[in-house]
């Protein structure tokens, strides 16, 4: 291995070329497989620049294959080629002074778009690269932030347990903190326009439509009264032990995940014509869409962040009630939902049972049973067939006359609460504050 490659990165790679596993399927052309093998040979004979160049060639070629058909139809073989390309490109960048952050980004995109190779080698290299350049990233953060946000405590000065998420996120949601108490008592005048905080109205809930709340039910009680009959319920006290409820702050997320690349939704809701997605670092997302409210709506939504960043996964747990399903723990899909006040998930349904755990901020949620489907006017298209055409909080009664006849339940989900959404139940979600939620899809 060439000495220009950081020793910590070299330590993660196989010791010899013979131990470097290249496993590709029959669909991959011989010349492409030979390119992968030549890049590996370059790596082990110290031709790092050539190795990186071949990696870039593999990325470009396999990218065309990944985009030639529907993503679900793309075989693992070409995604593996993409991952090998990212690996070789990243190693090449590691040998260039000042390119560690770019190497991190290349590895992350390999994780997001490619397939796992060599026992999660890309993930292990990312962990190494994060350790190599933490001080550089912290210096960059301070430069972007300028003067430290008042009230946003330095993680170096306080241990995670010394402040709750309410305090840690207060400076971002506004210095005038939302007063505690019943949700219906929330005063929107407490928001300060000058602080660029949206003054979002909080719905006043009707007791007849409120989703019931239950404190730490037994597995049997939850199964018999909610899972089997398929009824929504807000669970309380079941995630109080999760470290994230005390540890997570904007600064903590930046420190642990700031340099990582993630997909961000741009636009108020995915049904809008101007909606789009873009890859960016968590730091860029926070700077543009959390700390600065003038760039429109950005939402880190429905992303398997915890598979990408194991450090964050250590702060949560899979709810015990998931054991009542037939699937194994590995088959449970865990998604992160992180965004400013005002993000909206249009009325839609999911094909699995759903536990939505609220970590930071509050969300207004309305749910409709499957029996109400005809009154909810789903899109006719195959892509959006699980999504309603109706704007739930501002429906067009002339266009959707039966919508007002649909029965629903609703809640305001607060930190520490978990909402059970039965399979295929329709649900609409709007963030009332800066919010971080974790969903668990299980069968």
Curated annotation (Swiss-Prot):
One of its GO terms (cellular component) is nucleus. This is Lysine-specific demethylase 8. It catalyses: N(6),N(6)-dimethyl-L-lysyl(36)-[histone H3] + 2 2-oxoglutarate + 2 O2 = L-lysyl(36)-[histone H3] + 2 formaldehyde + 2 succinate + 2 CO2. One of its GO terms (molecular function) is histone H3K36me/H3K36me2 demethylase activity. InterPro entries: ARM_KDM8_N, Cupin_8, JmjC_dom. It is found in: Nucleus. It comes from Xenopus tropicalis (Western clawed frog). Pfam families: ARM_KDM8_N, Cupin_8. Gene3D superfamilies: Cupin. One of its GO terms (biological process) is G2/M transition of mitotic cell cycle.
